[in-house]
Regions:
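Extracellular/lumenal N-termini and interhelical loops of multi-pass eukaryotic membrane proteins
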Residues: 1-34, 267, 271-273
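Alpha-helical multi-pass membrane domain signature
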Residues: 33-306
């Protein structure tokens, strides 16, 4: 489930939405049929990704507690906020997947549906925020020029995340009681996807500028073993950055597609095909997991800022 692909469906037939004023506005599979069609793949998807996100949360908390101050000594706040956001995202995703995955239960309470939908959206915001803060740490640590200075600071990213989360809460609550206000959900989904796409592109731009700076500094590398070793370390970091950029760009492009396509609030379909849903959501969960993994890898490979 993503923040833009859930639906509360009680019946298994094609009854009208009007009987269920609190139903979700986005199309989803007919869960009674979908679970039978997907079989063991449904179970593997739910419990597999629940375990992955639980590990992401556990690793984030463990790293905060056991490794604080080990790296990025001048940017402990950045580091703590980034890993805290990952911990929240991993925890919320795993809870929702284990409790009521994609709001697929036929006997879900209204409060449970609303909690799951909002929690999933908050997790999406936290993953995107962590992805952004990791880029900020890299840009500041390597002193790479990238965009206006007032946009390259932790308070700005935290404020942006909180604004997105508050708008998410507002839009979900309004649409919950007034489904005709679905444009609010649409704006929320497009904003999240666009934010992620911009950050993904910035990873590539920052990486390209770091590479340019590295090549400029390698003129005398053969005179300095230390410089040569540092250049190799930076090359590995750049490779990770480009992979993170690629996976992020694909993920947020898929998110944008689902927001404006047949998975979105303006789709004319009520139900979508089980296998179409499974492919899209499995792809997104995989890419989100890889983004988190690459954040951790970049943390270990990034240069110290002493």
């Amino acid at each position: 489930m993503t923040a833009n692909k859930t639906k509360y469906i009680i019946p298994s037939n094609e009854t009208s939405y009007s009987k269920y004023p609190n139903s979700r506005v986005e199309p989803s599979p007919n869960w009674l049929i979908a679970k039978r069609e997907l079989g063991w793949l449904w179970v593997a998807h739910v419990y597999g990704f629940a375990a992955i996100f639980a590990l992401i949360a556990t690793f984030s908390v463990t790293f905060i507690v056991c490794k604080r101050g080990a790296i990025f000594k001048k940017r402990k706040a950045h580091f703590a906020v980034m890993l805290s956001a990952l911990a929240v995202a991993g925890f919320l995703r795993s809870v929702v997947l284990l409790w009521n995955p994609y709001v697929s239960s036929n006997n879900s309470l209204d409060s449970q549906v609303l909690f799951c939908v909002i929690s999933w959206g908050i997790a999406t915001a936290c993953i995107t925020s962590s992805f952004s803060i990791m880029l900020l740490i890299l840009v500041e640590t390597t002193k790479t020029s990238l965009g206006p200075e007032r946009l390259k600071n932790l308070p700005f990213l935290i404020t942006m995340t909180l604004v997105n989360v508050l708008y998410l809460l507002l839009s979900e609550l309004v649409v919950w009681f007034h489904p005709e206000a679905q444009v609010m959900i649409f704006i929320c989904h497009v904003a999240f996807a666009s934010w992620g796409l911009v950050v993904s592109i910035c990873y590539s731009v920052a990486g390209a500028r770091m590479w340019r700076n590295l090549k400029a500094s390698l003129g005398g590398a053969f005179f300095s073993r230390t410089l040569y070793q540092e250049s190799n370390s930076l090359k590995r970091l750049l490779i990770l950055m480009f992979f993170a950029s690629s996976f992020g760009a694909i993920n947020f492009t898929v998110s944008l597609y689902t927001a404006i396509g047949e998975f979105g609030v303006y789709s004319e379909k009520r139900y979508i095909k089980s296998w179409d849903w499974f492919i899209v959501h499995s792809t997104q969960r995989t890419l989100e997991s890889l983004q988190c993994i690459f954040i951790f890898l970049i943390v270990f490979k990034a240069p110290n800022d002493d």
